[in-house]
């Protein structure tokens, strides 16, 4: 069940959902807007001949911070990691989906490639997978609205929520845009 603005506020007011910093003006009819932090992780395309999710490639990305109040310029066809300004913490019976903002999508900005789902129990900055599908560069201003979180109530609390020992939870408590850690639990079935 998708939570309404009334339910979102109630979950925040009683401390079950934490959005930090919280700004009530970000609450929408069935979502809460999130803003862009000031850190970006750019890909170093010359370091490796290819990306291999089965091995650690420590120099694959580099952390970048725009100077002062300057925007980050995302060029056509470019892909970077960024993160929400807000720290998001969910209880064991709520999951979330990160969706893009319609106005930014109409400019060619993709907010996430595939990883828009946030498990119950997660706590941390949400990593964004930003792509520019437009034919012109896009200015990304730290602090701008970048997406919206929709909250869903589970039919029952997760038996092993994100952050529990069972799943490893490689991104629990992440700060800023976090590079892939797929190598930590890479799985391949012989076919």
UniProtKB/Swiss-Prot annotation:
<dbReference type="InterPro" id="IPR011962">
    <property type="entry name" value="dCTP_deaminase"/>
</dbReference>
<dbReference type="GO" id="GO:0015949">
    <property type="term" value="P:nucleobase-containing small molecule interconversion"/>
</dbReference>
<comment type="similarity">
    <text>Belongs to the dCTP deaminase family.</text>
</comment>
<comment type="pathway">
    <text>Pyrimidine metabolism; dUMP biosynthesis; dUMP from dCTP: step 1/1.</text>
</comment>
<dbReference type="Pfam" id="PF22769">
    <property type="entry name" value="DCD"/>
</dbReference>
<comment type="function">
    <text>Bifunctional enzyme that catalyzes both the deamination of dCTP to dUTP and the hydrolysis of dUTP to dUMP without releasing the toxic dUTP intermediate.</text>
</comment>
<feature type="binding site">
    <location>
        <begin position="127"/>
        <end position="129"/>
    </location>
    <ligand>
        <name>dCTP</name>
    </ligand>
</feature>
<dbReference type="InterPro" id="IPR033704">
    <property type="entry name" value="dUTPase_trimeric"/>
</dbReference>
<dbReference type="GO" id="GO:0006229">
    <property type="term" value="P:dUTP biosynthetic process"/>
</dbReference>
<keyword id="KW-0378">Hydrolase</keyword>
<feature type="binding site">
    <location>
        <begin position="101"/>
        <end position="106"/>
    </location>
    <ligand>
        <name>dCTP</name>
    </ligand>
</feature>
<dbReference type="GO" id="GO:0006226">
    <property type="term" value="P:dUMP biosynthetic process"/>
</dbReference>
<dbReference type="GO" id="GO:0033973">
    <property type="term" value="F:dCTP deaminase (dUMP-forming) activity"/>
</dbReference>
<feature type="binding site">
    <location>
        <position position="162"/>
    </location>
    <ligand>
        <name>dCTP</name>
    </ligand>
</feature>
<dbReference type="InterPro" id="IPR036157">
    <property type="entry name" value="dUTPase-like_sf"/>
</dbReference>
<keyword id="KW-0547">Nucleotide-binding</keyword>
<keyword id="KW-0546">Nucleotide metabolism</keyword>
<feature type="binding site">
    <location>
        <position position="174"/>
    </location>
    <ligand>
        <name>dCTP</name>
    </ligand>
</feature>
<comment type="subunit">
    <text>Homotrimer.</text>
</comment>
<feature type="site" description="Important for bifunctional activity">
    <location>
        <begin position="116"/>
        <end position="117"/>
    </location>
</feature>
<dbReference type="GO" id="GO:0008829">
    <property type="term" value="F:dCTP deaminase activity"/>
</dbReference>
<feature type="active site" description="Proton donor/acceptor">
    <location>
        <position position="129"/>
    </location>
</feature>
<protein>
    <recommendedName>
        <fullName>dCTP deaminase, dUMP-forming</fullName>
        <ecNumber>3.5.4.30</ecNumber>
    </recommendedName>
</protein>
<feature type="binding site">
    <location>
        <position position="119"/>
    </location>
    <ligand>
        <name>dCTP</name>
    </ligand>
</feature>
<feature type="binding site">
    <location>
        <position position="148"/>
    </location>
    <ligand>
        <name>dCTP</name>
    </ligand>
</feature>
<dbReference type="GO" id="GO:0000166">
    <property type="term" value="F:nucleotide binding"/>
</dbReference>
